């Protein structure tokens, strides 16, 4: 039995240093959301050590922490991409809390490819049992929120947004967050497929199709995006795609 457990880059106790967090760095958080991810990691570790570390256990567990995931189908409130898509589809202004905050943006298909690669390798390699892995973009593809907005705006007309970082009271929000994904590259031979601009293009194209097609053909369009992603991975000789 293989189980891939998924938390988030928010699981790390973020002190906003300039280098990416490694899997051995301290977990925690200064806000309830981040702290909840740290607590999930503790719960996972407890079960691994208590129930699945005996020699006769047939369960292998992998732990994953993904960078900021974007992509079609996300409708959560107070998330930068869905908020922009909803507002811009109605020619409305969207409020941006932290335009200069930097995040490890990645398309949702990127960590999914990592989860599947980890699960497949866990089945044949018991040495990976109980290990944690970061899945995110390379360091040079961490971008501020404003750059994300500017890139998304290229695909919309009449884009409007308002910087409320100085005028709005809100909960603690980190200004800088990076992940170090060297371990996934070394152990799993995994690396992201898409460049930043490709990530934004695929994301915005999904939402534009949704609003234009009134949800009638999103299944087929979503499958087409998965196939496009897989073709790109093959053409770029990503190890998980070749296997």
Q: What annotation goes with each model-predicted range?
A:
Residues 31, 79, 83, 144, ...:
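Amphipathic alpha-helical recognition patches that constitute DNA-binding helices
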Residues 44-47, 84, 184:
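Structural element of the ATP-grasp superfamily
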């Amino acid at each position: 039995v293989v189980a891939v457990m998924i938390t988030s880059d928010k699981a790390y106790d973020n002190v906003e240093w300039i280098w990416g967090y490694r899997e051995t760095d301290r977990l925690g958080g200064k806000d309830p959301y981040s702290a909840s991810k740290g607590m999930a990691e503790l719960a996972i570790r407890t079960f691994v050590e208590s129930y699945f570390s005996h020699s006769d256990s047939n369960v292998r567990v992998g732990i994953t922490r993904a960078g900021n995931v974007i992509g079609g189908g996300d409708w959560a409130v107070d998330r930068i991409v869905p908020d922009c898509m909803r507002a811009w589809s109605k020619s409305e202004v969207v409020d941006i809390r932290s335009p200069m905050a930097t995040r490890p943006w990645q398309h949702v298909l990127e960590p999914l490819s990592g989860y599947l690669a980890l699960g497949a390798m866990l089945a044949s390699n018991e040495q990976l049992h109980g290990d944690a892995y970061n899945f995110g973009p390379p360091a040079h593809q961490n971008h501020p929120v404003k750059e994300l907005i500017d890139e998304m705006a290229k695909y919309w007309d009449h884009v409007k947004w308002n910087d409320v970082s100085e005028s709005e009271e809100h909960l603690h929000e980190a200004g800088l967050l990076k992940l170090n994904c060297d371990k996934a590259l070394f152990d799993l031979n995994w690396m992201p497929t898409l460049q930043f601009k490709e990530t934004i293009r695929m994301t915005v194209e999904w939402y534009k199709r949704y609003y234009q097609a009134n949800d009638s053909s999103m299944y087929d369009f979503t499958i087409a995006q998965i196939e496009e992603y897989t073709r790109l991975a093959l053409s770029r000789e990503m190890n998980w795609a070749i296997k």
